Amino acid sequence: MARISGVDLPRDKRVEIGLTYLYGIGLSRSQEILAETGVNPDTRVRDLSDEDVAKLRAYIENNYQIEGDLRRWEAMNIKRLADIGTYRGRRHRQGLPVRGQRTRTNGRTRRGRRVTVAGKKKAPAKK
């Protein structure tokens, strides 16, 4: 079983896809890593030798920030924006879109589900 940065790569997938299970590594970066280390992208994770896994692990740890380190770095950047009082930091704190999107309609991904507010009940009709 291939384990890199505390993440078990899925055994039945190709190495090229398996590496994308690491936070911070997408398909392009995965292909780049495999080209640099000389590992065949079509190999299944279960068929990797210990030497290949060690080579991949060493290359990734030396050249990229992934998993916990990357998450911590992102959180620190967001916290820095909030601490210095920027508009972007305020939007992060409020849980609203940060990059200028409209919020009168849409923006539901960032804001979450609608919370319905009970309206006034209609007064009974007079006869």
From Swiss-Prot:
<dbReference type="InterPro" id="IPR018269">
    <property type="entry name" value="Ribosomal_uS13_CS"/>
</dbReference>
<dbReference type="InterPro" id="IPR001892">
    <property type="entry name" value="Ribosomal_uS13"/>
</dbReference>
<dbReference type="GO" id="GO:0000049">
    <property type="term" value="F:tRNA binding"/>
</dbReference>
<comment type="subunit">
    <text>Part of the 30S ribosomal subunit. Forms a loose heterodimer with protein S19. Forms two bridges to the 50S subunit in the 70S ribosome.</text>
</comment>
<comment type="function">
    <text>Located at the top of the head of the 30S subunit, it contacts several helices of the 16S rRNA. In the 70S ribosome it contacts the 23S rRNA (bridge B1a) and protein L5 of the 50S subunit (bridge B1b), connecting the 2 subunits; these bridges are implicated in subunit movement. Contacts the tRNAs in the A and P-sites.</text>
</comment>
<dbReference type="Pfam" id="PF00416">
    <property type="entry name" value="Ribosomal_S13"/>
</dbReference>
<feature type="compositionally biased region" description="Basic residues">
    <location>
        <begin position="101"/>
        <end position="127"/>
    </location>
</feature>
<keyword id="KW-0820">tRNA-binding</keyword>
<dbReference type="InterPro" id="IPR027437">
    <property type="entry name" value="Rbsml_uS13_C"/>
</dbReference>
<comment type="similarity">
    <text>Belongs to the universal ribosomal protein uS13 family.</text>
</comment>
<dbReference type="GO" id="GO:0006412">
    <property type="term" value="P:translation"/>
</dbReference>
<keyword id="KW-0689">Ribosomal protein</keyword>
<keyword id="KW-0687">Ribonucleoprotein</keyword>
<dbReference type="GO" id="GO:0005829">
    <property type="term" value="C:cytosol"/>
</dbReference>
<protein>
    <recommendedName>
        <fullName>Small ribosomal subunit protein uS13</fullName>
    </recommendedName>
</protein>
<keyword id="KW-0699">rRNA-binding</keyword>
<feature type="region of interest" description="Disordered">
    <location>
        <begin position="93"/>
        <end position="127"/>
    </location>
</feature>
<dbReference type="GO" id="GO:0003735">
    <property type="term" value="F:structural constituent of ribosome"/>
</dbReference>
<dbReference type="GO" id="GO:0019843">
    <property type="term" value="F:rRNA binding"/>
</dbReference>
<dbReference type="GO" id="GO:0015935">
    <property type="term" value="C:small ribosomal subunit"/>
</dbReference>
<keyword id="KW-0694">RNA-binding</keyword>
<dbReference type="InterPro" id="IPR010979">
    <property type="entry name" value="Ribosomal_uS13-like_H2TH"/>
</dbReference>
<dbReference type="InterPro" id="IPR019980">
    <property type="entry name" value="Ribosomal_uS13_bac-type"/>
</dbReference>
